[in-house]
């Protein structure tokens, strides 16, 4: 059993994700958690600011000797995917070797990089080390509205190496501030992520529709799609649309809502099957929540804020950047190569479905290529 009141935790990578997860560190370790945390940054930028803000030890540079002294029960890795191999080979592997020579217990490693896969950590660190890879829920509040009930984090691990006793409980406790925990196979997690990123492109759909509706048109388009989706799926919805859509507006965009939702959903359901071939129940949990969350953002946040948010997510070479490029290309393709992305007010559900499905597929393939390096 893990004694959370005495356990330590180290965070390698105190950037955006490292800071975002601070409530999770507190929930996991409990009272007095500040005295049992070590956070590590690559440089000393903002070092003093972060120390004053959080009140726990934060250092810059090589942390191997501090890890040996602290011997944390939990080791959180929140560096960028392209940095992960260097951190694991240069710091984590030597630390694990030290523990092994000492006959000391191994930490549970929690990685926040979407790649590499959990099996890679097993190959590099050994079968006595357990690693979980987490795609955390990124929002529990939007525009002042509590969306905790819609938030879900995806967790994967090496399916060939069962988690040790207490690890599932520890992960659930750790992620509790961020909503539900969905345990997935690596393949399923990638398919669900591809679906979610495709739903993220609702931003671009509503941006493109803004011209049809005038001032506030982006939020209005999102409100119409939101009302359609909640009504079709029989969900109450967290908030009323910005303006209650007229029936004519709903008829105008019904094809787009249904096709966009079902295309990415069917891709994830088909590519996220369990090892026995059965469809995963996680897709039915995540899809309506993700669709609603993105449409809520469009109704409750400014377009400028959302454009910056999308830009931040679309890191060079990543899956979201791929989605943005393919979104524009696929719409231009169905419009006969017309320059620019114009979303028609009239269309067919099959057209929206086809673009959504193909977009999820392209994003998925980018994710697989990133996993393979």
Please describe what each predicted stretch is.
Residues 204:
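Active-site loop-to-helix "anion-binding N-cap" substructures in soluble metabolic enzymes
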Residues 161-185, 311, 319-327:
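A charged, well-structured terminal subsegment
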Residues 14, 189-192, 314:
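Structured catalytic cores of enzymes that bind and process phosphorylated ligands/cofactors
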Residues 37, 47, 67, 84, ...:
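Small-residue helix-packing motif on alpha-helices
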Residues 140-141, 176-201, 214-257, 279, ...:
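Conserved Rossmann-fold dehydrogenase catalytic segment
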Residues 1-7, 227-373:
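NAD(P)-dependent Rossmann-like dehydrogenase/reductase catalytic/cofactor-binding core
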Residues 1-74, 174-177, 211-217, 270-276:
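NAD(P)+-binding Rossmann beta1-loop-alpha1 motif at the extreme N-terminus of oxidoreductases
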Residues 21, 54, 58-170:
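Rossmann-like NAD(P)(H) cofactor-binding subdomain of soluble oxidoreductases
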